[in-house]
Structures are given as structure tokens and as C-alpha cells.
């Protein structure tokens, strides 16, 4: 699955993370040093999974507006063969594959759990979800996993995003992250991408779930119906295409392999919008009427918070490919909420490690005021302070993502004059960075 790019492994033990092997590439120098001998300070700018992607660069017409900006996102070194399969579903994806693998794996895991339970009812197959990601016979695609189930075995699905190995809360104990960097054309430079494997399979759950139902006993009792709740509109719409492609590809390939419960998996499209609308609520209501058994989504942690109770209390499984808020780890979800995206405790350490590794001694964090922004900002700040930066040199500033003007919050960064600024946001990040560039604290060279 790896393509030879730099890879690091970080192990998680409780709340601590330990770097086991450093990646190459010679990026240990401080990118925040002054440029060309000038006394003017070049501030390092970092992003996160909500904004680091080529769609951010499309908001800028001036060359070099994002040059040198770095960021982290849950990302696997996807094989070219898998990317080609995604591009057949959506040729317009280009080089944007954020959460495509996680979306694909969420569907496959759901289908395998349904096959193990021989039921399309989420309250019946939900207890099997964690167990198909660890402990059994290794398999890397739906068909080979189904062959194991058909013979009475338990599959250990190692999907396109890695070993997975879900922990008790229904989330990965191991995850892959990408460290990304924008070039002078305001696009991500794939040659500068580095991958980090984070976590420890020893933290996976130990209970593999109930014994499998007799294979074939669920045939003819109803098809597995999956609804999408992914961002086709709103502030995260740039993540929609790769996620939709991942879900669509998975359903297509499952059905090509014979489907589940003796029938093709049925896929129902659906938009999540964002928190400025009630689109997610409307989509969930529509999915309930359609009789879906599982919902893939939402992408935004804040959007998920608006509908998770409705979904899980209705006995529908909810499986997010992109939620990262730590709050879902302990959320009361009736055992029906799962995610292939790793929690913020992992991304916060990865980004803090990058920031300190590059020599930054003071950091400003600009984060949208919501479940996603405040949670990730706090994790990053905690990790920076644990790395030796004092509270007085790590400042968090929260903003309204629906604001029409971001001058005030950017001015706080100007006044702070830090070595590094982290922007935690979605589509509005482009407007914030534009103001940062105008005020001399952005990534523009």
C-alpha cells in the first residue's frame, strides 16, 4: 500500500504518544526563518483536515498566496490503483482524495458486519462492527472477507486506510496521517507529502462481538440499505466529492462481488449541508422514510451533533468517515455510532509535533467556534504546552465561521506576532488567509 514516501510511526499509550521512527526529508529546519536575509519575519502557517486541500488554493488567483503553508489530515498513502478506481467514479477528483479511503472502508465494514449478523437491522449487526476490524483472518477487500465469513470464519478487514483495529468506542486504534505542503501554484505538492502511522493495535477492542449467524440464513429477508449524509453544499462541500466517490465505489464493488444477504446493497444519496442550514435534519428524515439501515456521514462533527440522537435512537447505524471530535469517543450512542476517522487526540499530536519540530517558539491558533474547531485547538495547545511551550506563548482565538469580516481576529494574530499560526476551519479559511496575507502574517512569500 505504501509508495516509498517518508513514513513515520507514532504509538499511542493512554494520552501519550511516542515517536518511534523519524521520517526523512530534511525538514528539521525552522521554516519560520526570515527570507532572503530580510529582517521581516516570515510566519509559518499551518492548516488541518478541514482546509488543507487543493480546493483552498482555488480561492486564490495570485501566485504564491499559499506557498509553504503546511498542514495535517488523516490520509493514507493510497495506491495508484485505488485512486484510478476512484477517478473512474468521479474523473473530476484530480488530486483531492481526502477521506475517500475512510468513506470506502466505512461502507465495507458496515456490509461485513451485516453479513456476519445475517441481518440488515442495525441493532442486530451493530455489535459486529468492531470485530470485523481485528482478531480474525486477515483480508484486504470485501470479496476475500466474504469468503472467510462464508466458511464460518471471522474476518479482520485491513482496508485501504490501513489496519483499522477499532477500539471499544468504535473508532480506529491505528490511523495514518499525511503532512502536506502547498507549492507556489497554490496546490499541494505531492512530492512533499509525508505519511505518519499513529496509534497502537494493542489498544484495539478485545471483544470480537457475537458469534456469526449461519451464513445464508439472512438471504431474502431484506436488502442492506445505506444512506449518504455527506457535504454536497456548505462550508465542507470540497470534501464531498472524494467521500461520495469512496462510498459509491464501495457499493459498486460490493454488488459486483455478489452483494450482502443475497441481494445488492441499495444506496440512497443525501446532502448534509452545514450548520448554517437544517439540510442534515431534512436528509435524515428522508432517509428514515426510505428505510435506510445505515447512514454514512456526516463529515462535520458539528453537523453530526445535530442529528446523531435522531439517527441512533431510531435504530439506524451512523458511520462517519471524517468526524474527529474527541467528544464522540464517550458519546451515548446506543452502540450505533462508528467512525473510520481518528479522533483529534491523534491529529493534535501530529500537528503539534510538526510545529515544534520546525522550531516555532510561539503559536497563535485561529479556530472556528464549534465542536470541531474548539476541540482540535485545545488538543493542539495542550500538546504544544506538553512539548515545552508556555501558556503565555500559545494563544487560542475563536471566530464565527459565518462572519462577513475576519479583520478583528487576524489583528489579534498581528498583535501576537507569533512564529506560527494554525488555522482550523473549513471553506472560510480562504477568506481568513487572504486577510492574513494582506496584514503580513499569512503564508504569501
Spell out what each predicted region is:
Residues 2-9, 13-14, 20, 24-445:
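Extracytosolic ligand-binding ectodomains
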Amino acid at each position: 500500500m505504501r509508495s516509498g514516501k517518508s513514513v513515520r510511526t507514532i504509538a499511542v499509550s493512554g494520552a501519550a504518544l511516542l515517536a518511534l521512527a523519524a521520517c526523512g526529508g530534511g525538514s528539521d529546519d525552522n521554516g519560520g526563518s526570515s527570507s532572503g536575509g530580510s529582517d521581516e519575519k516570515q510566519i509559518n502557517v499551518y492548516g488541518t483536515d478541514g482546509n488543507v486541500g487543493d480546493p483552498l488554493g482555488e480561492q486564490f488567483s495570485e501566485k504564491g498566496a499559499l506557498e509553504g503553508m503546511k498542514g495535517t489530515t488523516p490520509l493514507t498513502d493510497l495506491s495508484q490503483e485505488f485512486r484510478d478506481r476512484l477517478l473512474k467514479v468521479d474523473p473530476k477528483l484530480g488530486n483531492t482524495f481526502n477521506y475517500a479511503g475512510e468513506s470506502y472502508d466505512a461502507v465495507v465494514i458496515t456490509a461485513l458486519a451485516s453479513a456476519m449478523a445475517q441481518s440488515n437491522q442495525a441493532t442486530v449487526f451493530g455489535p459486529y462492527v468492531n470485530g470485523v476490524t481485528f482478531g480474525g483472518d486477515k483480508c484486504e477487500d470485501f470479496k476475500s472477507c466474504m469468503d472467510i465469513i462464508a466458511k464460518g470464519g471471522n474476518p479482520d478487514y485491513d482496508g485501504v486506510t490501513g489496519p483499522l483495529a477499532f477500539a471499544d468506542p468504535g473508532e480506529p486504534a491505528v490511523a495514518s496521517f499525511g503532512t502536506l505542503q502547498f507549492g507556489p501554484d497554490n496546490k499541494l505538492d505531492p512530492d512533499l507529502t509525508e505519511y505518519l502511522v499513529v496509534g497502537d493495535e494493542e489498544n484495539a477492542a478485545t471483544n470480537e462481538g457475537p458469534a456469526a449467524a449461519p451464513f445464508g440464513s439472512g438471504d431474502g429477508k431484506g436488502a442492506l440499505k445505506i444512506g449518504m449524509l455527506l457535504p454536497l453544499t456548505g462550508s465542507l462541500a470540497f470534501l464531498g466529492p472524494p467521500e461520495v466517490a469512496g462510498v459509491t465505489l464501495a457499493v459498486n464493488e460490493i454488488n459486483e462481488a455478489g452483494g450482502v444477504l443475497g441481494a445488492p446493497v441499495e444506496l440512497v444519496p443525501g446532502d448534509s449541508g452545514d450548520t448554517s442550514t437544517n439540510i442534515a435534519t431534512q436528509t435524515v428524515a428522508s432517509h428514515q422514510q426510505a428505510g435506510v439501515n445505515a447512514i454514512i456521514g456526516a463529515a462535520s462533527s458539528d453537523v453530526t451533533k445535530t442529528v446523531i440522537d435522531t439517527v441512533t435512537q431510531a435504530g439506524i447505524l451512523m458511520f462517519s468517515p471524517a468526524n474527529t471530535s474527541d467528544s464522540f469517543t464517550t458519546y451515548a450512542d446506543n452502540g450505533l455510532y462508528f467512525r473510520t476517522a481518528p479522533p483529534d487526540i491523534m491529529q493534535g499530536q501530529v500537528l503539534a509535533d510538526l510545529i515544534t519540530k520546525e522550531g516555532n517558539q510561539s503559536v497563535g491558533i485561529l479556530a472556528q467556534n464549534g465542536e470541531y474547531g474548539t476541540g482540535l485547538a485545545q488538543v493542539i495547545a495542550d500538546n504544544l504546552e506538553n512539548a515545552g511551550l508556555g501558556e503565555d506563548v500559545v494563544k487560542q482565538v475563536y471566530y464565527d465561521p459565518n462572519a462577513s469580516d475576519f479583520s478583528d481576529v487576524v489583528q489579534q494574530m498581528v498583535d501576537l506576532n507569533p512564529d506560527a499560526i494554525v488555522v482550523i476551519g473549513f471553506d472560510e479559511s480562504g477568506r481568513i488567509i487572504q486577510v492574513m496575507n494582506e496584514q503580513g502574517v499569512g503564508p504569501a512569500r
